């Protein structure tokens, strides 16, 4: 919130019904962004769902991490270098699953059980559910990549 965004770098996805409307919409979009693509409503819907996973959900996980750190007297900023490196690796590849790390991808059940025990002592039972669901998804995905 409150950050300035260089709109030229933001991809815009356009849809139109006539060639004339298409020219108008494309001209306007190209005046705003260097990345303009055509996409119908269904494709934009899938794109939006992907953005929610990549941005909204990851930010929520940052918030959970922040709460866990706060209980130890630490600021979320301590994870900054790790978060930035992880994001940089993910966007530098066409297959973020290929650069996935952590106990789930390694099948390190000892570490995962230890984490689950820690999370079980938290005031929010959803933390363990989220941890288990994501770990299972990471493990299953890692077997396919």
Please report, for each region that a protein language model flagged, where it lies by residue.
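Interdomain hinge/lid region at the active-site interface
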Residues: 70, 81-145
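Internal alpha-helical scaffold of NAD(P)-dependent oxidoreductase catalytic cores
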Residues: 1-92
């Amino acid at each position: 919130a409150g950050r300035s965004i260089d709109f030229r770098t933001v991809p815009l996805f356009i849809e139109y019904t006539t060639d004339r409307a298409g020219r108008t919409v494309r001209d306007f979009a190209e005046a705003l962004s260097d990345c303009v693509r055509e996409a119908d409503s269904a494709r934009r819907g899938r794109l939006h769902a992907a953005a929610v996973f990549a941005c909204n959900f990851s930010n929520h996980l940052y918030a959970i991490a922040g709460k866990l750190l706060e209980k130890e007297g630490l600021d979320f900023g301590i994870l900054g270098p790790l978060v930035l490196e992880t994001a940089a690796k993910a966007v530098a590849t066409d297959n973020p699953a290929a650069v996935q790390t952590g106990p789930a991808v390694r099948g390190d059940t000892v570490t995962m059980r230890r984490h689950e025990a820690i999370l079980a002592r938290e005031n929010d039972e959803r933390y363990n559910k989220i941890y288990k669901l994501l770990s299972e998804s990471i493990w299953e995905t890692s077997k396919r990549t």
